[in-house]
């Protein structure tokens, strides 16, 4: 017997939607949603396709996700071509199977089943879908959220279908995310010949004590919901490639994943004070890709936990670790935001796959959340 969730997931995987190219995925979803009474508003920005769809009125539960995927890598190393979905030993293989076309299929089928059972549901059910989450994320969910906020759209609850689970579907629910702040720092020196250091000013030597102190700072101890803030140097560049030239500049890029114990302004101030302490000549640029957010126990978390306990008979962990997601933008609307999706063990990897039975289970969980919040 065919399964509508698996069939839709396979149809989506066949569309090679390398970010930000949607490759027809959203048209497929929109067709299904319009067929059950959704109003669909395309919101394209630049090279990115997005849509906002809704059905009903009042208290709003949105399902959010992305149709874009990362590159497949070496296709010859896949057990099957990455955009030709195949099922082996109960596992659905294909780029995007876990991140996150499987979730998208589960959302749409859950909505179809929900509307069939509750054609006159009391609340509003919505979808917020983008084709730019894996790349720059500049013309995707953030732009849709800005548009919705400008016209005072209501959004009470949002379930993001990111692959949150680690071993079995539903074992982990993300009810928040750390903030992400990147510093692009250039230390200025004076280029010269290595044999005449008194005629130059080596920026690497100048920066070394400051960087040593920077990496040893304990920024905070975290709290009940967040691990301690982490700072990692990601890139260091200096020199001409020649062994007889003292470099004129040194570029250092570092990233903070920060908890609710700090603000981005507090981090910036401490870094600048450190630069001043060591009397460095510098240029600095900051990129804040997201503030930390947290959804405490409430209607959405309770509904998601209840759905998982009902179908998988496990109590999920509520965690905030891992990378950022589009939930950071949606949280700006004042919505309760959680992430629930399939197992993430193979995301972005060669032979990405997801248990086909997990997608069927996920669709049931999503439907139960709908029933608890907007039926």
Swiss-Prot record:
Keyword Metal-binding listed: yes
Write down the EC number.
Answer: 3.5.1.18
Q: Which organism encodes this protein? A: Klebsiella pneumoniae (strain 342)
Q: Which residues form the active site?
A: 68, 133
Identify the enzyme class: hydrolase
What gene is this protein a product of? dapE
**Where along the chain is Zn(2+) 1 bound?**
66, 99, 162
Where would you find the membrane-spanning parts of this chain? Answer: none
- List cofactor names only: Zn(2+); Co(2+)
**UniProt xrefs under NCBIfam families:** dapE_proteo, PRK13009.1
Q: What GO annotations for molecular function exist for this entry?
A: acetylornithine deacetylase activity; cobalt ion binding; succinyl-diaminopimelate desuccinylase activity; zinc ion binding
Give the reactions, separated by semicolons, that this protein catalyses: N-succinyl-(2S,6S)-2,6-diaminopimelate + H2O = (2S,6S)-2,6-diaminopimelate + succinate
Report what the protein is called.
Succinyl-diaminopimelate desuccinylase
Record note on cofactor: Binds 2 Zn(2+) or Co(2+) ions per subunit.
Q: In which pathway does it act?
A: Amino-acid biosynthesis; L-lysine biosynthesis via DAP pathway; LL-2,6-diaminopimelate from (S)-tetrahydrodipicolinate (succinylase route): step 3/3
Which superkingdom, per the lineage? Bacteria
Pfam families for the chain: M20_dimer, Peptidase_M20
Give the record's subunit note: Homodimer.
């Amino acid at each position: 017997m065919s399964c509508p969730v698996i069939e839709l997931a396979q149809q989506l995987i066949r569309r090679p939607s390398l970010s930000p190219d949607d490759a027809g995925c959203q048209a497929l979803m929109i067709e299904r949603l319009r067929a059950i009474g959704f109003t669909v508003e395309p919101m394209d920005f630049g090279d990115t396709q997005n849509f906002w769809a809704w059905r009903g009125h009042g208290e709003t539960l949105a399902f959010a996700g992305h149709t874009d995927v990362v590159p497949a890598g070496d296709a010859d190393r896949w057990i099957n071509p990455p955009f030709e979905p195949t099922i082996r030993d109960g596992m659905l293989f294909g780029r995007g199977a876990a991140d996150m076309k499987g979730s998208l299929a589960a959302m749409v089928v859950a909505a179809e089943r929900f509307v069939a059972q509750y054609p006159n549901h009391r609340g509003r059910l919505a979808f917020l879908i983008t084709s730019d989450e894996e790349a720059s994320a500049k013309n995707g969910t953030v732009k849709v959220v800005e548009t919705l906020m400008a016209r005072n759209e209501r959004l009470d609850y949002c379930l993001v279908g990111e692959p949150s689970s680690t071993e079995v579907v539903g074992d982990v629910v993300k009810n928040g995310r750390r903030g992400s702040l990147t510093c692009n720092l250039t230390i200025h020196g004076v280029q010269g010949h290595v044999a005449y250091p008194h005629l130059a000013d080596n920026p690497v030597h100048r920066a070394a004590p400051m960087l040593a102190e920077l990496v040893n700072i304990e920024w905070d101890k975290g709290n009940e919901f967040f691990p301690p803030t982490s700072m990692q140097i990601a890139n260091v560049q200096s020199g001409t490639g020649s062994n007889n030239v003292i470099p004129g500049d040194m570029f250092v890029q570092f990233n903070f994943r920060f908890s609710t114990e700090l603000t981005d302004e507090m981090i910036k101030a401490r870094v600048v004070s450190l630069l001043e302490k060591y009397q460095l000549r510098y240029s600095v640029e900051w990129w804040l890709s997201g503030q930390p957010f947290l959804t405490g126990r409430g209607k959405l978390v309770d509904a998601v936990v209840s759905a998982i306990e009902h179908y998988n008979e496990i109590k999920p962990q509520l965690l905030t670790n891992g990378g950022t997601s589009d939930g950071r933008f949606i949280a700006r609307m004042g919505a309760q935001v959680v992430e629930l999706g399939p197992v993430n063990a193979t995301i972005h990897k060669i032979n990405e796959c997801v248990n086909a039975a997990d997608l069927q289970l996920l669709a049931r969980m999503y439907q139960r959340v709908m029933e608890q919040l907007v039926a």
